[in-house]
């Protein structure tokens, strides 16, 4: 029968079948949708060493497990605020109760609307109350975005694999 030809940077393979095992694709964090957010050096999507934020003003965006867990972790070492667009969090009930009992400043239902800063460093986050014109300004040293992840199947398109509704057509 017909053979598939696969060319890599090192060699050429021929096979009767090709199995593409890539799960949901490559994952990357959902970006903060505020104009210019990518230009600020203190807008983060992951934490590598929590101790470096000790004593600094930390704000966490999101309402799921990661956001609540990070807010609780930061609270032990830094003044911490969490901003979520809904009144209720999607995190584990136990974690949400712990959050409510903690010193974390909880801002709900608010969404981030503007970053203010200079020289590539944000100093304040403006938040807007949902279904309202009410705004607040939060001083920040660091902003952590925990909006989950999105998957990408970009390589498949580049490879010329035929897709149907973001899935490989078989």
Language model features with spans:
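C-terminal catalytic lobe of FAD-dependent flavoproteins
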Residues: 120-170
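Conserved beta-strand segments of alpha/beta enzyme cores
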Residues: 42, 79, 105-106
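A conserved short coil-to-beta-strand element within the FAD-binding core of flavoproteins
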Residues: 1-4, 108-122
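Short, glycine/charged-enriched secondary-structure capping and boundary segments
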Residues: 32-37, 73-76, 95-99, 122, ...
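Rossmann-like dinucleotide/flavin-binding elements
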Residues: 45-92, 132-137, 148-158
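N-terminal Rossmann-like dinucleotide/flavin-binding domain of flavoprotein oxidoreductases
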Residues: 1-12, 89-108
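FAD-binding core/adjacent interface of flavoenzyme oxidoreductases
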Residues: 1-56, 131-135, 144, 168-170
């Amino acid at each position: 029968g017909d053979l598939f030809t696969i060319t890599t940077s090192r060699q050429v393979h021929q096979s009767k079948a090709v199995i593409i095992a890539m799960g949901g694709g490559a994952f990357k964090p959902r970006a903060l949708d505020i104009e210019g957010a990518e230009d600020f050096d203190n807008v983060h999507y992951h934490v590598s060493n929590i101790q470096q934020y000790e004593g600094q003003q930390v704000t966490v965006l999101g309402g799921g497990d990661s956001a609540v867990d990070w807010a609780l972790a930061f609270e032990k070492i830094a003044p911490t605020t969490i901003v979520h667009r809904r009144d209720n969090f999607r995190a584990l009930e136990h974690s949400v109760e712990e959050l409510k009992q903690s010193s974390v400043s909880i801002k709900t239902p608010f969404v981030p609307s503007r970053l203010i800063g200079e020289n590539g460093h944000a100093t304040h986050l403006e938040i807007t109350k949902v279904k309202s014109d009410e705004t607040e300004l939060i001083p920040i040293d660091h902003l952590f975005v925990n909006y989950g992840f999105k998957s990408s199947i970009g390589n498949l398109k580049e490879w010329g694999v035929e897709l149907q509704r973001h899935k490989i057509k078989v």
